Amino acid sequence: MSDDVTPIRQQYLEIKRQYPDTLLLFRLGDFYETFDQDAEIASRELDLVLTSRPIGNGLRAPLAGIPYHAIENYLARLIDKGYHVAICEQIGDQPAKGIFPRKVVRVVTPGTILEAGLLPVNSNNYLASIILQEGRAGIAYVDISTGEFAVTELDAPAGSSPASLNQDFGPIRAELTRLRPAEIIYPDNLVLPDGIPGHITAWPAWRFEPGKCQETLLSHFGVSSLEGFGLQGKSLAIRAAGGILQYIKETEEAALPLLSGLRLYSLSEFMTLDAATRRNLELTETLRGELRGSLLGVLDQTVTPMGKRNIRQWVSQPLLELDRIRKRQDGVEYFVSHSMPRAELRAALKPLSDLERLTNRILSGHAQPRDLVAMRETLTNLPKVQQSTKGSQAGEEELLPTSTFLPIFDSCSDELNMLQSSIDDDPPATLQNTGVIRPGFSPELDGVIQASSHAREWINNLEPAERQRTGIKTLKVGYNKVFGYYIEISQGQAANAPSEYIRKQTLVNAERYITPEMKEYETLVLNAEERIREIELRLFREVCSELMKSARRLLDTARALAELDVLSALAEAAALGSFIRPMVCEDNGLDIRDGRHPVVEQMLHGERYVPNDITFEEGEAIRIITGPNMSGKSTYLRQAALITLMAQMGSFVPATSATIGMVDRIFTRIGAQDEIHAGQSTFMVEMIEVANILHHATSRSLLILDEIGRGTSTYDGVSIAWAVVEYIHNHPQLRAKTLFATHYHELTQLADFLPGVRNYNVAVTEADGNVVFLHKIIPGGADRSYGIHVAQLAGLPRPVIQRAAEIMSELEKSSGQAVRINPQSAQQVALFPETNPLIDELEKLDMNSLSPIEALNILFEWQRHFLDKKK
């Protein structure tokens, strides 16, 4: 390395070489500086001024800086754009000679965020890893802000080849769509399937080597075998979990203690919902990305951050275990039938902070004084939460048998007592300022503070005392960082300075002095400030260390509070929406009476919603539903799926009664708007989704099929739709419960020879030429589509409506034969009046600039134009 390069430049280059793929924030005093290409990126992405800094040998390097106190705001913008940011800090004290030692203390990536201000409040911030090998996959995910760590293995779809998996592995896409990870890491020698969501980070393949990953897991958990985690023989799960731990060690090592457990889960524990179904049913967000209008938007009545994350998971993962479903229902039912305890519980939960993330910030060493204040206030409210679940405040005679279906939790009284005695009521935001520790907690700290206070008081009284003693009215006591405290006397009275004053500085208009006694008190004050800061930092860390010992109890309490919040929230939603408890059972039936769409009903704002039954009778497998657009077919289909899903997540449902046979998967084929931009036609997208359904549905699945075959010609569409219905009906391992909405009236003939098919239609009434949609599903096929009426409601121009009616009349007369439209009626219909070019010319004329002769010439041309048209 050249001797001409400055020491700071040398240090920077050495550190940057270790983190070449990151944007390096290099601490220099009160700023984080970026250099070279990093500076150009920071300037562009953060709207920073791009300057330069000398680097030796007459050269300068691009430079852009961020104030250290504002780093969180800038960091958020960089992470949101997918950058990995290495934070390099000054370590220890500056040596007498040379520069500060510096090191990278963490690398912040989209999946390794711990800053409260950067984390999504109502959802998890997952980091995921993927391994693919020989038709199988391993997925691990972790949220370092909550300590959640889980892993699974996925089987390939039946009939898939390893080559095809790298192009389209549906189960991976479905699981990652559920998780919505902020970042995904994978071996850099792997080709990922298309459509994987989130920021993607390729990592060296050797990091995922089986032996290395197993050793990483054994070392992290301090065990000699992974059998206790259920990972024996699951090499892909081990590689995914071990790889993600190594990534966290490289980026945010302080987060490793947060990961105290690893949960192996199977997709067979939960209802399968592929990406298309989650999107079509708008479970957690609408097609526009909004919460309002989604199922979660209706059900999420939670009042704590932990509860909001938890209810999102419940909506995203309906259960397949009957006992767990019924236990959740029992909790919801208690709060539905006990409205006063529900209200008291929700009031007690509302002030709570995010205990789960607060605990993990303490464990990671990122906690600040106000985090402990938030924890103290949360723990203070726990007795109220416990009391509200007993019903005694509401005058209930019975005590809630919490051990049966409600989570129980510790009041954490020891932790609360420690926080109450140690942390000040209103501490500073950061540990860089004093005032963190409550007076009386530490005799040592109190003594230093008292001595400092006495010294400050002496210095504060020095000016009036010396003025009176010396008689010098211009005498002042001041302070600066160069000389410390000093006595200043104007030049006119400097000759009267006492002999014990020691001259320190001469100014144009004044002399400055010090005294030995003043310097002693100055030393007491200045040393005391640093001493107080050191003692408070040590005590704060000791308090955090004690809380770390209680981390498991605190986290268990946080998760119990989250579950209580969700149960009471579902009860609140049930009360607001007049939901009932469904009967979930192991058979294959579906009987919903007076079912309603939970979202559409809420959007009606008090208007009457027309309920419908969804009852599959003995031997019935497929309902073919015909009827006009805008009549409610799609709403009917979706409400069947949503009611089933709500029942299996443990919620009450919008109906007067409901018996739900356990459904293993819900599939939907509704629309193709999201994939057209990827280069696939609407019809191709439709056929791919139908193929996926037919390959993976089982006899316990629920299929929602809307307008199969509409993306091609009528004959092709009818043929494909017909064949799909036959396949579902006749396949010995399929015959799934199916709701099939269609405009192809020919499909109603299937009920004549397929015993499991039934026809239904949407009731319509006509009066005085007007059509009224009754939104009621009734037996039988529809006799007309009423499409022209829908077009009229949509506001098409009257000439189009009239012309469509004429053509419809001709088509109906043809009785299915080739139609010859009357030439006279086939003339082009003018939808809008044609604009006369002379009018356009008149509008453009500038009358103020025309001469009389020019105006006469224009009139002559117009006259000739009209005369020519008459000929």
Locate each region found by the language model.
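Extended, charged helical/alpha-beta scaffold domains that provide interaction surfaces
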Residues: 8, 460, 467-491
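Charged, surface-exposed helical/loop "interaction arms" that form contiguous linear patches used
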Residues: 364, 368, 378-381, 400, ...
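ATPase nucleotide-binding head domains, primarily ABC-like/P-loop NTPase cores
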Residues: 36-37, 234, 303, 312-314, ...
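Charged catalytic and DNA/RNA-contacting regions of genome-maintenance
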Residues: 1-334, 343, 350, 354-363, ...
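Extended, charged coiled-coil "arm/hinge" scaffolds of SMC/Rad50-like chromosome-maintenance ATPases
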Residues: 507, 511-545
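Active-site phosphate-binding and catalytic loops of NTP-dependent enzymes
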Residues: 88, 112-119, 255, 392-401, ...
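Amphipathic alpha-helical transducer elements in NTP-driven molecular machines
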Residues: 5-9, 25, 32, 36, ...
